[in-house]
C-alpha cells in the first residue's frame, strides 16, 4: 500500500507535465501570451503554428498547401 501511492503520484505528475509541455505545440503563443494564427484562418487549424515554429516571422501561411512562404 505504501508503494502504490507514491508510484501513482509520480505517474500523475508526469502526465500533467507532458500535457503542459506539449499543449502549446499546436498553437504557439507570442511574447504577450496571445495565440498566434493566420489572419484568414480558423481557430482549429495548425498552419500558422507550423509557420511560427519554423521561424518564418516575416512570412505568411499559404492556406491551400499549409506551407510557410517568405515575403519578397
UniProtKB/Swiss-Prot annotation:
Q: Name one GO cellular component term.
A: extracellular region
Principal subcellular localization: secreted
Disulphide bridges, residue numbers? 38-61, 47-66, 51-68
Tissue and organ expression note = Expressed by the venom gland.
- What keywords does the record list, in alphabetical order? Disulfide bond, Ion channel impairing toxin, Neurotoxin, Secreted, Signal, Toxin, Voltage-gated sodium channel impairing toxin
Q: Which SUPFAM superfamilies match?
A: Scorpion toxin-like
Q: Where on the tree of life does the source sit, at the highest rank?
A: Eukaryota
Q: Name one GO molecular function term.
A: sodium channel regulator activity
As given in the record, the signal peptide range reads 1-21
* Protein localization: Secreted
Q: What does this protein do?
A: Binds to sodium channels (Nav) and affects the channel activation process.
The entry's family comment says: Belongs to the long (3 C-C) scorpion toxin superfamily.
- What's the name of the protein? Putative sodium channel toxin Ts18
- The organism named in the record is Tityus serrulatus
Amino acid at each position: 500500500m505504501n508503494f502504490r501511492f507514491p508510484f501513482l503520484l509520480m505517474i500523475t505528475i508526469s502526465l500533467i507535465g507532458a500535457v503542459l509541455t506539449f499543449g502549446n505545440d499546436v498553437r504557439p503563443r507570442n511574447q504577450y501570451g496571445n495565440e498566434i494564427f493566420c489572419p484568414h484562418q480558423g481557430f482549429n487549424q495548425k498552419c500558422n503554428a507550423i509557420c511560427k515554429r519554423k521561424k518564418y516571422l516575416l512570412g505568411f501561411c499559404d492556406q491551400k498547401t499549409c506551407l510557410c512562404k517568405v515575403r519578397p
